[in-house]
Amino acid sequence: MNNNYESHAISRRSFLKASGVVGAAGILAACGGNSGSSSTAASSGATSAPNTTGATPLKEFISWESTNRELESWNMLYSQMASDMNVTTNLWEGLLSFDCYGKAVPSVAKEWSHNEDSSVWTFNLRDDVDWVDVNGEVKAHLTSKDFLVGLEWVLNAAKNQANNTSMPNETLVGAADYYQKTSDMGDAAADLTYEDMLAAGVGVEATDDYTLVFTCKNPCPYFDTVAAYTSFYPVSEDLITELGIEGFRACDYTNMWYNGPYVVEEFISQNTKSYIPNPNYFGADDVSRFDRFTVTMISDGTVTFQLYQNRELDEMDVGESTLTTIQADPNSEYNQQLCEKRPKKFSYQMHFNYQKNNEDGTPDDNWNKAIANTAFRQCFYKGLELTNWYARTNKINPLKCENDYYTMPGVCYNTKGEEYTTLVAKEMGFDKESYDGKTMIRLRSNNGDIADLKKQAMDELSAIGVTFPVHAAYYIIAGNSTALDSATVLKQCFTDSFGDDFIVLDIKTFVSSLTQEVRNPQLQSFVINGWGADFGDPINFVGQEILHDDNAYYSWYYSNIAKIVEAGPADWQKDLVAAYEEFTDLVNTAKAIVDDTDARYAAFAKAEASMLNNVLDCPCYFEVAWTLTHANEYSKINAMYGPCNYKAVNWETSEEAYTTEQYEEFAAAFDAATQA
């Protein structure tokens, strides 16, 4: 067994019944050779977990994470990394949480409302929430003041170092000004308190111990999804006083205070982390919890299947090689247990670099001229057949991974209940199309035939000195065989779709940092990257691509189009810049509509369609993987934004692995409930 799984001591807390020396395998042995003791209630507390199959549920559960995604910060207010929040969401609660349909549900806030134009939002808090230490002992009572303290911490540059400021700065009256004030003050700002924030006019107030009122700059009908993010989480002033500014910023599980469903039982970096129920959790009667939830860190994916077979994991993602192994044996019990997961919340796109450099630092004008040409870019969207590449993620149903839009489906709905990307589909003429398992939706209108576009692009580009084939540099991390295999398949997709006389994919490698070695020196032709929403509005996606905005992440750091505009475009870039200006104007027009949600989303759909028709970047895929599991994925939190998806509450589980048939029933029931 890999040395990440060697035995180690686990120290039980005083309120647990058992103690002993166990490892990932030892936990199983202590429980009779499986991942958890079975009982009629799969949770700690009065609420039973959902059970739609009559199965024997699990009281303990072992999940996994890759070692390259180990937690780096325990501070929910400070961290901006999903890998951190996947842990701390189990320990730290904010105003709202979410359910398995992605709907906001009460957490510390028991109810919330807004005024007529959605510019003022009121959150009524529970009066039974306590802060506890790692031993589950009560340290303080939580009131509305703790949310004021938390927000001041986030907005204070001397305390939180600018992390997680964008959402309050964009939405709340006075927030950006207060942040700038603290930035200008330097270290002296560390002495400011929430009272200074209120005196500065930031749009938040605690009208009593259990009522919070936020005032937005403009009507903001989606503010509840903003307030669910970590920027608005609470912290006790007493804890900050106890630890000090530096100490709280760097707090860990041993000295932080908890108000979430679990406390940390044990943490061994790059090995395991385990949570046990918070004995003073305010929601103990509202949600089900495990008696122990363990996350095992995996450095080598080749051992995952063995761990699952040994019941040292209760769930695993099934990669292409494992899937091939299972399907090659018709007698394997696992053939009937392969379950397809829901898409993860990230929309992946091919982000073109319009200002590429050669490795010697000189401009790669052959690529730069080519990618600035509209017909050349349209060949990607209308002609790149990716089914074989999708099969690297989902071998059985590869086209489930097809992504034709920029925004992730499910982020927001209009007042008619129409999901936002269906509005984009109408603008693109795809609204009558649906998944058929055979052909990519966006290639159907022309059957993937780009002969005319290819000729147009080659004629126009040859006239300005471009030579063919155009070479596209695609970087992967060195020494990773999985990444190399996927890139090799993608290279063949380029050959089959474009022809090697037109575009050739060159696979290149970096040692450790894509940002430092590739993106900063601008060596890539494109990067495939995913974006997940922080809140429920299209601006969270399309706003990353516009011009004339310092916060447009992709425009500055991936496509470099903002730098081109800042310096002044070349003649051969003027059509590209014009397309970006049109898109930017459409986004800003949509953003300005703050009193009509339907009109706002319709306007954003037109903007997104403009981006797609001009292929300013190219949507690629969704992560839709297969799993072997003892947990019903459809019972887990499934929000398209916020930090809560890895919170281990209300999970339906089974001592016996779920079957393919059961998962198909789960999916059908979920889809029916969603539509209803």
Each language-model region and where it sits:
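Detector for C-terminal structural segments
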Residues: 381-425, 478, 482-492, 516-676
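Ligand/substrate-recognition segments at binding pockets and active sites
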Residues: 269, 307, 397-398, 434-533, ...
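Gly/Pro-rich hinge or "lid" segments in bacterial periplasmic/extracellular proteins
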Residues: 186-191, 198-201, 207-210, 215-294, ...
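Aromatic- and charge-enriched surface segment that lines or borders ligand/interaction sites
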Residues: 110-175, 213, 304-307, 366-372, ...
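N-terminal secretory signal peptides
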Residues: 1-10, 14, 18-30
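Alpha-helical secondary-structure segments
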Residues: 139, 144-149, 209-215, 261, ...
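Extracellular/periplasmic solute-recognition and catalytic clefts
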Residues: 67, 265-279, 294-361, 387, ...
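N-terminal lobe/hinge region of extracytoplasmic solute-binding protein
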Residues: 64-117, 257
